[in-house]
């Protein structure tokens, strides 16, 4: 049975020792991270979900401050320069980042904090917080992943090709993470995440 570890000593400790828990949820674009995350939060309101900042435009139905903090590229670069992110990365031509202060405050207060982030950011967090629990979500097959990405109907053929190439590369990194979960059956994948978090 996997235990979620408390973060005691961070590799980059200018911060105080942390008493809460940090969970990283990552995987390639289109694998269902966001849908799994939303269901997890509905079933477990005690979890703290870290809302990321991004420079990409909102998708239909996304709400600023709930889905993401939508900011301009110049504002994002200013926040990077000020050290306001725990991690930041560029993906598909847009920046994404995890706000530092809110996450550290929640972890220090003893909360279970879940970060749903891209691979590059997940690697940064694992370096800074080696005791964080990391979960990599995999598609049942690459063909299914392609169907999901195309099914969104939001990207050009060129953007889809870029996402698919990046997804191939990211899937190769799955073994870097503590737990790998295949999102074939949604409910089973959700339950596997719950077991990892709560035992």
From Swiss-Prot:
Residues binding ATP: 27-34
InterPro entries: GK/Ca_channel_bsu, Guanylate_kin-like_dom, Guanylate_kinase, Guanylate_kinase_CS, P-loop_NTPase
One Pfam family here: Guanylate_kin
Catalytic reaction annotation: GMP + ATP = GDP + ADP
Keyword terms, alphabetized: ATP-binding, Cytoplasm, Kinase, Nucleotide-binding, Transferase
GO MF annotations in UniProt: ATP binding; guanylate kinase activity
Subcellular location: Cytoplasm
EC number(s) from the headed UniProt entry: 2.7.4.8
Keyword Endoplasmic reticulum: no
The keyword Kinase is annotated on this UniProt entry: yes
Disulfide bond annotation, renumbered to this chain: none
GO cellular-component term (any): cytosol
Domain Guanylate kinase-like: 20-198
Segments forming a coiled coil: none
Main location: cytoplasm
CDD domains found in the cross-reference section: GMPK (cd00071)
HAMAP family tied to this protein: Guanylate_kinase
Function: Essential for recycling GMP and indirectly, cGMP.
Family of the protein in this entry: Belongs to the guanylate kinase family.
Protein name: Guanylate kinase
């Amino acid at each position: 049975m996997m235990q979620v570890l408390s973060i005691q000593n961070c590799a980059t400790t200018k911060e105080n020792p942390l008493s809460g828990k940090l969970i990283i949820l990552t995987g390639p674009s289109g694998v269902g991270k966001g849908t799994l995350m939303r269901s997890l939060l509905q079933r477990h309101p005690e979890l703290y979900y870290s809302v990321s900042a991004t420079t990409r435009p909102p998708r239909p139905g996304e709400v600023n401050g709930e889905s993401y903090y939508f900011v301009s590229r110049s504002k994002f670069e200013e926040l990077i320069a000020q050290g306001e992110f725990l991690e930041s990365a560029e993906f598909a031509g847009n920046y994404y980042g995890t706000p530092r202060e809110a996450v550290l405050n929640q972890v220090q207060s003893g909360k279970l904090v879940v970060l749903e982030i891209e691979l590059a950011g997940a690697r940064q967090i694992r370096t800074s917080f080696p005791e964080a629990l990391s979960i990599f979500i995999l598609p049942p097959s690459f063909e299914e992943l392609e169907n999901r990405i195309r099914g969104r109907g939001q990207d050009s053929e060129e953007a889809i090709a870029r996402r698919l190439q990046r997804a191939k590369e990211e899937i190769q990194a799955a073994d870097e993470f503590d737990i790998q979960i295949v999102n074939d059956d949604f409910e089973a994948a959700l339950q596997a995440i719950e077991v990892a978090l709560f035992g």
